[in-house]
């Protein structure tokens, strides 16, 4: 229901960015976007140190990251066959971010909002900041 609620609160939204991880939130976001607002683009942020989703998209089958090294440990789960299928059909792109970019996003949220968030939650923001040209309408 989160996609439905976002669309109701912001009817003009045209892009959503979520963390990658095991693909549950990402695939659910994709399906919700496809159902409630066809044409709504969904992107995923993924740590470079746990890039199994990017590898899986490239190979067309569920892959494990060749190495795992990230502060965003909430995203260490692997895609399933079903989530990969949904992501292949509906995700606009998976955007890789470095550890430094994740830490910079964490710092930005703390400095601006005075809240501490989990590193995995900072990954989508890091992806947006790194790819500002892709999201220029958002700034």
Language-model regions, residue ranges each:
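PLP-dependent amino-acid enzyme catalytic core
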Residues: 1-139
């Amino acid at each position: 229901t989160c996609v439905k609620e976002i669309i109701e609160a912001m009817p003009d939204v045209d892009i959503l960015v979520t963390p990658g991880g095991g693909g549950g939130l990402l695939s659910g976001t994709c399906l919700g976007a496809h159902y409630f607002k066809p044409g709504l683009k969904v992107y995923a942020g993924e740590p470079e140190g746990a890039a199994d989703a990017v590898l899986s998209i490239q190979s067309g089958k569920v892959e494990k990251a060749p190495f795992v090294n990230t502060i965003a440990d909430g995203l260490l789960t692997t895609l399933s066959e079903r989530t990969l299928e949904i992501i292949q059909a509906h995700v606009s792109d998976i955007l890789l971010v470095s550890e430094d970019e994740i830490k910079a996003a964490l710092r930005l949220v703390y400095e601006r909002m005075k809240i501490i968030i989990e590193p995995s939650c900072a990954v989508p923001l890091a992806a947006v900041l790194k790819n500002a040209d892709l999201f220029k309408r958002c700034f």
